Each structure stands twice: as C-alpha cells, then as structure tokens.
C-alpha cells in the first residue's frame, strides 16, 4: 500500500452543505432557516437562558449564599509527599515550593494525614490536621505552626 492509495473511512468526511443555491438543491430560498422571525435574520441568536419572554429559571430561583472576601485557601500537602525529603530535614514552605511539592504557597501550607510518613522530619507549616501532627510526632519528628 502506498500513500496515494489511502482512503478515508466511510462516513468520516462530510461534504459541506452549500445553501441558498436554487430550489432544486432542497436548500434554496430560505437556506434551511424556515420562514420569518428572529432566527431567520442574520445575527439572530437567542441569549443563553432565554425562554421566549417567560421569566427565566435563573431569575425565578432565589439568590443563595455569599462569597467570603476573607477566605483563605491553603496549599495542601499530604504525609506521603513528605517522604521525598531526607531523614532529619527541616521542611519549610519555601522548601516545599522549591522542590515542586506545591506550586505556590497561596495563603499558607496545610499538612494533611493522607498516606504514611516513613522519615523523621521537622515540619513547619501554617496548619496541621490532628492526624498529620500525630503521625509526624510519632516518627520522632516535630511539627511547628508558623
């Protein structure tokens, strides 16, 4: 088989439908747009959520909740990610960013207890879950809230 003998799979290529080219084509005159009306005109699109003038669903439902402007988002680090460091290392937020464990610090670092810790480490972070703090201390390491 040569390159010029390759054929596209049956039905994978559709012929472009040219509209407005005479009544005999089946797509002449109104070009598949039906008769008059907003959708027959050029640029005649309806905005998302428009229900023909009926009060739309998003306006019928009540507003709910609010966005807390003081919300802090913490970068999450799990225990199994800390195994990357050598025994006895002091793990700081700067070291976590530098080593690529977290992309950026955000509002701080929070250490969670997923996985298991195999090394003795001194971990400095902004928050610790109870299980994470317990696991770090159990391995002979230390956790320090900064």
Curated annotation (Swiss-Prot):
Residues 23-35 have a biased composition (Gly residues). One of its GO terms (molecular function) is structural constituent of ribosome. GO terms for biological process: translation. Coiled coil: none annotated. Transmembrane segments: none annotated. Part of the 50S ribosomal subunit. Belongs to the universal ribosomal protein uL15 family. Binds to the 23S rRNA. PANTHER family: 50S RIBOSOMAL PROTEIN L15 (PTHR12934), LARGE RIBOSOMAL SUBUNIT PROTEIN UL15M (PTHR12934:SF11). This is Large ribosomal subunit protein uL15. It comes from Staphylococcus epidermidis (strain ATCC 35984 / DSM 28319 / BCRC 17069 / CCUG 31568 / BM 3577 / RP62A). The gene is rplO.
């Amino acid at each position: 088989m040569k390159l010029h003998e390759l054929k596209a799979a049956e039905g994978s290529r559709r012929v472009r439908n040219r509209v407005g080219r005479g009544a005999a084509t089946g797509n002449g005159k109104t070009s598949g747009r039906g008769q008059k009306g907003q959708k027959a005109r050029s640029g005649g699109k309806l905005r998302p959520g428009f229900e023909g003038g009926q009060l739309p669903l998003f306006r019928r439902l009540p507003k709910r909740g609010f966005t807390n402007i003081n919300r802090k988002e913490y970068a999450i680090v799990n225990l199994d990610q800390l195994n990357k460091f050598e025994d006895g290392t002091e793990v700081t937020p700067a070291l976590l960013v530098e080593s690529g464990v977290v992309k950026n610090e955000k509002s701080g670092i929070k250490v969670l207890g997923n996985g298991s810790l195999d090394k003795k480490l001194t971990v400095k972070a902004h928050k610790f879950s109870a299980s994470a703090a317990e696991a770090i201390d159990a391995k002979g390491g230390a956790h320090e809230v900064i």
